[in-house]
Amino acid sequence: MLNQGIILNIQRFTLHDGPGIRTEIFLKGCPLRCDWCGNPESFKRGIEIGVYHNKCISIEHCGSCLEVCPENKMLIYSDAMLQQIDRQQCTGCLSCVDECPSEAIKQWGDYMSVDDCMTVIRKDRGFYDRSGGGVTISGGEPLLQSDFVYELFKACKQEGIHTCLESSLYVNWNRIEKVLPYTDLFISDIKLMDSTLHKQHTGVDNRKILKNIKLLVELDQELILRIPVIPSINDDDTNIEATADFIKNELNNRVSVLQLLSFMRLGEEKYESLGLPYKMKTLSFERYEFQARVNGIADYFNQRGIHCLVETKEQSKAEHAEYKQNKTSRGR
C-alpha cells in the first residue's frame, strides 16, 4: 500500500539532520553495504529478528521462545543459552519476540501508515514552529520506499511542516523527482570519489550518486553534503582533493554546507545480533590524531572556499578551534 512504510525507528527531538528540533523517521532497506555502517538492521527492507544472547536467561529458567516457535529447530542454543537463529528456516511469525521476557529477541522494523506517523509528528508541532524544525526521513535508503515518502511529505507540507530527506541518492532519478515537490532539504554523502574504491567499500559504484547530486544542484535544490571520514579508507589527500574539485568544478560550489562526520565504532553488537560480520572490528587508529586529521581536512575545504564544518552544527567551530589550540600546545 502506498500509505504504508516499513519503519525502523522514529526518534523525536533530534538536532543533527536538518535545522531546528526534528522528528526523524528511519525507513528500512538500503542498497549499499558500507563497511563502516553502524546500522546493519537497516540493510534489509523486511522485518527482521535480532538475537542478543547476553540477555537470554536460559532454557532452564525460561524457554518461552521454544514453546511458541512453530519451527523450534531454528533456534540455536549453546550451554542452554540462545545464541542465534537459523534465518533460512525462520518463518518470521515474530511469536518469539512477543514472548521473550528478557528482550533477548528483538524485532527490527514494523509497518506504519502515513496517519500513524503524522500522529507522532503532530505531538511536536510546537517545537518545530519555535525552532525552525520539522520532519526528516532517513534510512537505510528511504527512496526505496519513495511512494511512502511522497505521501508522508505531502501530508507534512499540507500542515506547513518543514521536510528533509537524508538519502544516499543511489536510486533512479524518477524516485527523487517524485518527492521533489514536497522536499525542502536534501542531505547526502560523498563517501569516495574513486568509483572502484567506492564499490569496494560500499558495494556499489558512485556514478549514479554523483549524477543525482549534480541534477539536484542544477535544480537549485537546497542540499547539504556530508563526508563520513573513515581512517585509512577515505581520509587521504587524493580523495579529499578530488572531492573538493568535484564540489568546486562540477557543482559550482552550490551546496549549503559540507559536513565532516568523524568515524565512530558503532553497531558491533547489532551486527552480532543479526549474524553478520563487523568489518571495522580490526580497524586500529588513535582517536586524537584522527580527529586532528579531520579538522585539517575541514581547514583544507574552507581554504578552497567550500563552507565546511566538523560534525553538523555551527557550534562545532568552537570544538574545531579547541582541537587546533590543543594541537599547537602539544607541539610546544
PLM feature spans:
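N-terminal pre-triad scaffold of radical SAM enzymes
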Residues: 7-61, 83-92
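Auxiliary Fe-S-binding modules of radical SAM enzymes
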Residues: 2-19, 231-332
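Iron-sulfur cluster-binding cysteine motifs and their immediate structural context
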Residues: 35-42, 63-84, 95-110
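Conserved AdoMet/S-adenosylmethionine-binding subsite of the radical SAM
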Residues: 115-273
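Extended, non-globular alpha-helical segments
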Residues: 51-57, 109-124
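Short glycine-enriched, charge-decorated loop/helix-capping segments at active-site entrances
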Residues: 51-53, 199-205, 275-285
